[in-house]
A protein has these predicted regions:
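N-terminal capping/small domains of soluble enzymes
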Residues: 91-196, 202-206, 388
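Iron-sulfur-cluster electron-transfer modules
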Residues: 39-108, 116-119, 133
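Glycine-rich beta-alpha junction loops
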Residues: 74, 117, 141-143, 204, ...
Length: 494
């Protein structure tokens, strides 16, 4: 593998992998390695965790039957090249602790399933907990049982990634209240060391109180009040509540009246200032916040039928959007709340676009003590927890941390208002001539979307210093990572 493009090729090849279940490449390995698991770890930003899953020395002399077994429709994944070229090392993490307290309750790790279809039956939750998830927030339930539509999902695609964003039309649980309570009871009995959270939704104060009481009686650890589902078919439920401060306050009080365990208020992002309903929740007795729920959306229009997605007998409706695309929105709301003088003292369970250990720890660095995941599980399965746990432990070890709690809030001081940013210095981009392939992408973007600070000839791109403002658009669009940052210097005349 050509060294100067090695990291880029490894990334491209691992993203090409279809991440098969019961993968043929692993079955074909004569040495007992798990190449599918190896590739998956790299895909989920855990290359050091991949180290123990194959032996580069053995693989270097192997004829790679794993590659011949690959079922990819457009050529085999270069498994052997990736294994023998990866810069990684074994890191012992035996003394790293992922345990953390959340809302006064100890969790073996902060990684939870969020309230959705991925946590909607006993068997599903049990499978997830067996694989290592620290807890589950069971699919929202109440006295109201909805009818669901078909189909109920659509996606926003980008190149060959089908899940940049994900839209759903699902509502609350379609099981009876008795069934849901029975499942929660079994889960807590069979998994006493895991955190079981009941997500509830009532139509009036009496229902909120009753649901809280019944949930505590079956042994759940925490109650989450769902004030934020954006696609409820019934008025006065879901995000309609989360946008109404009076209802938020009344329903939190009603929930607290029915139980003695911690209560979280789940916030809607379909509002300008999340601090307002969050403060109303806390002042009414909530013990913490969960954020964010999904963003109201339309994912697209079929320009031949003029139907939107997902099409339900020719129609659709505005509903919740999730996945990687909403992560920046979630991080912004988390930051707003954790910088609030009152809210910063209360625990937040972070939700929105989390796929990897790195995503999860970004939420924690901005103040979350806990995170929740749905869309990534729908796309890749519960197995993503393996690299969340491994990757987080390796990161903590490399950083010299003993406990994951040391990361919480670490990034907050680096986020300031725009008027406090340094405007007296600049970082100019530098083109790596060895890596540059002269494709001209930087030139096009700089000329048409920047400051006309790149000249282009047969020799490739050249930065025009007098025009460059250091915006770094060129660096971000370069397809081979051939543009780097230079040393920060004072602006001319400053």
């Amino acid at each position: 593998m050509e060294n100067k493009y090695k990291d880029k090729i490894i990334k491209t090849e691992t993203f090409k992998c279809m991440l098969c279940h019961n993968a043929a490449c692993t079955k074909a390995c004569p040495n007992g390695f798990d190449p599918a698991r190896f590739i998956r770890s790299i895909r989920f930003e855990n290359k050091d965790g991949a180290y123990d899953m194959a032996d580069a020395k053995i693989c270097a002399t192997c004829n790679a039957p794993c590659e011949n077994a690959c079922i990819h429709y457009d050529g085999k994944i270069r498994i052997k090249d990736i294994i023998t070229s990866l810069d990684a090392k074994k890191i012992d993490t035996y003394d790293v602790d992922l345990g953390i307290d959340f809302a006064g309750i100890h969790c073996i790790n902060p990684f939870f399933l969020s309230s959705s279809v991925v946590a909607s039956t006993y068997e599903m939750c049990a499978k997830a907990l067996d694989m290592g998830w620290g807890g589950i927030v069971f699919k929202t339930f109440g006295y109201y049982i909805p009818d669901e539509v078909s189909p109920r999902f659509s996606t926003l695609e980008k190149e060959d990634n089908p899940f940049v964003g994900f839209k759903n039309l699902e509502q609350t649980s379609t099981h009876s209240l008795e069934e849901n309570l029975s499942i929660l009871k079994r889960l807590k009995e069979n998994y006493p060391d895991r955190i079981i959270v009941a997500s509830i939704m009532g139509e009036n104060e009496e229902e909120w109180t009753s649901l809280a009481k019944l949930s505590e009686e079956v042994g759940v650890d925490i109650i989450e009040c769902n004030f934020s589902c954006p696609q409820m078919a019934k008025n006065g439920m879901g995000s309609d509540v989360g946008q109404n401060i009076d209802l938020v306050s009344r329903y939190v009080k009603a929930t607290k009246a029915g139980c003695s365990i911690p209560v979280l208020a789940k916030m809607t992002p379909n509002i300008g200032n999340m601090e307002v309903p969050a403060l109303a929740s806390i002042s009414s007795g909530a013990d913490g916040i969960a954020a964010i729920n999904t963003v109201k959306s339309i994912t697209g229009v079929d320009l031949y039928s003029f139907e939107s997605y997902p099409t339900v007998a020719g129609k659709t409706s505005i509903s919740g959007y999730s996945g990687k695309a909403v992560k920046p929105i979630a991080l912004r709301f988390i930051t707003d709340m954790k910088k609030n003088e009152t809210l910063k003292n209360y625990p937040i369970s972070g939700i929105g676009g989390i796929e990897t250990w790195q995503d999860a720890l970004e939420f924690m660095a901005l103040g979350c003590e806990n995170i929740q995941v749905t869309t990534a599980v729908m796309q890749y399965g519960y197995r993503i927890i393996e690299d969340m746990i491994s990757g987080a432990k390796i990161y903590l070890k490399k950083m010299g941390y003993k406990s994951i709690s040391e990361v919480v809030g670490k990034a907050l001081d680096q986020i300031v208002s725009a008027d406090h940013l340094d405007r007296s210095t600049v970082e100019f981009p530098v083109i790596d001539k060895e890596k540059c392939i002269k494709c001209g992408r930087c030139y096009l973007s700089c000329y048409d979307g920047g400051h006309q600070a790149i000249d282009f000839s047969d020799d490739g791109p050249k930065i025009i210093g007098k025009n460059c403002v250091g915006c770094h658009l060129c660096r971000l669009v370069c397809p081979v990572d051939a543009i780097n940052k230079s040393k920060r210097i004072k602006k001319v005349g400053r």
